[in-house]
């Protein structure tokens, strides 16, 4: 129901207020901030190559999906296997790896939660 209400508000705002609505996929609009930097420097989307470490879900809270839709591509890395399976399916132009990056070769514990954004190697 909430999605329907949001869609109606979106359509009404475009029709009645002539607003240009740009959708952000990032959690706090980081993709739109980066996009403004790219635009001000006249960087073409096809020339953008990203490296998304800790990519998470390929759509929800994604810092790179906005650019992927515009024609950019890159490498996504995430320790959560299910996220990488989704990346490979939903974003086939990207190269996706399922591993954990760190600054040592020690074996570490990976704590997995129902909300994957909370997954961590930290006990705290």
Q: Would you name each region that the model predicts?
A:
Residues 1-124:
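Phosphate/nucleotide-binding beta-alpha loop and adjacent structural elements of enzyme active sites
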């Amino acid at each position: 129901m909430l999605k329907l209400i949001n869609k109606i508000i979106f359509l009404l705002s475009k029709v009645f207020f002539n607003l240009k609505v740009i959708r952000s996929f990032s959690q706090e609009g980081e993709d739109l901030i980066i996009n403004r930097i790219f635009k001000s420097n006249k960087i073409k989307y096809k020339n953008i190559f990203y490296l998304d470490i800790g990519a998470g879900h390929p759509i929800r809270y994604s810092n790179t999906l906005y650019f992927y839709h515009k024609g950019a591509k890159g490498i996504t890395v995430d320790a959560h296997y299910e996220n990488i399976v989704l990346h490979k399916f939903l974003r086939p132009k990207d190269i996706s790896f399922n591993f954990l990056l760190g600054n040592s070769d020690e074996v570490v514990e990976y704590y997995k939660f129902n909300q994957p954004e909370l997954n961590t190697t930290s006990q705290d």
